[in-house]
Amino acid sequence: RRGGVKMGDYVLIQGPGQQGLSCTFASKPAGAAKIFITGIGRDKPRLELAKKFGATRTINVEEEDVVEVIRKETNGELCDVVVDVSGNPNAILKSVDCLHRQSTMVLGGLTGDTTVTPMLMDKLVWNEIKLQGCFTADNDATEAALRIIEETKFPVQEMVSHVFPLNEIEHCIRAIGGEVPGTFPTKALINPALG
């Protein structure tokens, strides 16, 4: 909703976590003609899930240049909306290059990097790009998302990749934080009934 996706838009989503996947399935009913989503090698299962959620094309940024892919896939038109939920400063910089003039960039991922802003500003101004921050969804957006899920019977439960018992809450938090080798949850849940 924050990106203002409308009929026929080309949308790029940077980051295939639960926010990125949610943006993917929300973009189709909003009217997006093409939906692109990026990730890295370890995101392969998430990128496959993104295809089920409506992504037209997935992009492994360790193997392909996102700007080149977007130029090719849009016949040089570039994107109307880019949503960055990766929090990766390099992805944010690439995002601007994937947008055409007078388009919209939504930032929903925190970087902690104070050096990105000065580098972006001139491109945003010259290309008249609207910059929209997004920290959380409002009530209207949440209600709309729930309606979409209910009406389309969308398989959002497939985002849940790990379920932990209550007595493993610390392990769950470490897994989410990337501290457990070989464990890379898309969405993790705690089920107190498991122990």
Segments and roles (model prediction):
Residues 33, 78, 154-158:
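A local structural motif
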Residues 1-64, 68:
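Mid-domain Rossmann-like dinucleotide-binding core that forms the NAD(H)/NADP(H) cofactor-binding site
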Residues 80-83:
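N-terminal Rossmann-like NAD(P) cofactor-binding module of classical short-chain dehydrogenase/reductase
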Residues 45, 51, 56, 89-152, ...:
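Glycine-rich phosphate-binding loop and adjacent beta-alpha segment
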Residues 22, 64-65, 72, 93-97, ...:
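C-terminal hydrophobic helical "lid"/dimerization subdomain
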